[in-house]
């Protein structure tokens, strides 16, 4: 199973290959494909916006976009946000914070953080002043966020010696930041050129 399909199945609900068991090595190497998965998420959101924008006002449409992203990704980012918020704002010592983050139950800080970030994302998308910029914003948002995941994995030490994050941190290719930074920079440029060509034809 290629790194791309592993990353796609891990970061989204899209399962082009039905496989649930991976080797630790393959799982760690899938980091290199994270931005490409972000690009796919962004293209789906931009397509959804293009289809619905003639019929739905901007405020409810952006709410649909935010909810669609949540459903498309399975809420993976939201789960991480809530766990992190519960741990960081618990006021406990380091080891206890890590235990709280690992706990599957959601605390009050996690709920507040999720609601706040969701409302903020909704309002920021709705506040984009020019409608022509919205599709590119919807593409760049998941693309850059998945690139930032790769950057964090390779740049910062993992808090635990074992776990899913350790596989990413220890087995991700050493050149992954350089490769993903270059590809992440050029992907939107290529899309912009294609969009301009299609618009002018």
Feature annotation, model-predicted:
Residues 79:
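Hydrophobic "anchor" residues on beta-strands that sit immediately upstream
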Residues 88-90:
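Catalytic P-loop NTPase motifs of RecA-like helicase/translocase cores
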């Amino acid at each position: 199973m290629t790194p791309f399909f592993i990353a796609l199945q891990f970061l989204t609900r899209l399962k082009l290959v039905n496989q649930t068991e991976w080797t630790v090595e393959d799982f760690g190497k899938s980091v290199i494909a994270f931005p490409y998965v972000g690009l796919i998420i962004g293209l789906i959101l931009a397509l959804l916006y293009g289809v619905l924008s003639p019929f739905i006002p901007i405020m409810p449409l952006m709410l649909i976009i935010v909810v669609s992203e949540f459903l498309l990704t399975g809420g993976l980012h939201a789960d991480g946000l809530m766990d992190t918020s519960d741990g960081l704002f618990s006021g406990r010592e380091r080891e206890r914070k890590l235990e709280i983050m690992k706990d599957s139950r959601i605390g009050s800080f996690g709920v507040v953080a999720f609601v706040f970030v969701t409302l903020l994302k909704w309002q920021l998308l709705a506040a984009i002043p020019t409608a022509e910029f919205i599709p590119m914003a919807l593409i760049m948002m998941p693309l850059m966020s998945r690139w930032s995941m790769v950057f964090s994995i390779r740049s910062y030490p993992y808090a635990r010696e074992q776990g899913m994050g350790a596989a990413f941190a220890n087995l991700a290719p050493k050149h992954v930041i350089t490769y993903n930074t270059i590809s992440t920079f050029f992907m939107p440029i290529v899309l912009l050129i294609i969009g301009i060509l299609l618009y002018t034809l």
